[in-house]
Amino acid sequence: MIHAGTRPLRVLVTKIGLDGHDRGSRIVAAYLRDAGMEVIYTPPWQTIPGVVKLATEEDVDVIGISSLATDHLIVPKMMEALRAAGLGHVGVVVGGIVPEAEQSALAAAGVSRVFGPGAAREEIVECVTALGQKSRAERVDDYSEANP
């Protein structure tokens, strides 16, 4: 089920750092749109503060980061910035060329999943759907605890 609540899941698909190769992120954005999600797609070369600001303004459920070169190495800093902004509930996935040795550091930072080249459409959609639903449930739980 793509809808969690009353509106489609909202996914921010972006590239941080200096990598400008966007073919993979465009394909994934189309997969998610075709599955009924609302996709906010940014141009390349985004900054961490810019992604955090956009995630807040757009009230996203999941963030997908595309990395062709080494831009995934700054994702742990982005995860810290998301938590500092109160967005720790937002699911984060990374797609692209990420060496296996570096995937554990991303997981330790809070990245839910790393998709390599050739990841199946169904696998991506199922993962993002589950993360989006979890994000919304955690947001509701956080709100309920803060407003008894």
Swiss-Prot record:
One of its GO terms (biological process) is acyl-CoA metabolic process. Adenosylcob(III)alamin binds at residue 21. Its EC number is 5.4.99.-. InterPro entries: Acid_CoA_mut_C, Cobalamin-bd, Cobalamin-bd_sf. Its cofactor is adenosylcob(III)alamin. This enzyme and the derivative PCM-F, a variant in which the alpha and beta subunits are fused into a single polypeptide via a short 11-amino acid linker, have potential applications in bioremediation of pivalic acid found in sludge, in stereospecific synthesis of C5 carboxylic acids and alcohols, and in the production of potential commodity and specialty chemicals. Pfam families: B12-binding. Residues 8-138 form the B12-binding domain. PANTHER family: METHYLMALONYL-COA MUTASE, LARGE SUBUNIT, METHYLMALONYL-COA MUTASE, MITOCHONDRIAL-RELATED. Belongs to the acyl-CoA mutase small subunit family. This is Pivalyl-CoA mutase small subunit. It comes from Xanthobacter autotrophicus (strain ATCC BAA-1158 / Py2). The lineage of its organism: Bacteria, Pseudomonadati, Pseudomonadota, Alphaproteobacteria, Hyphomicrobiales.
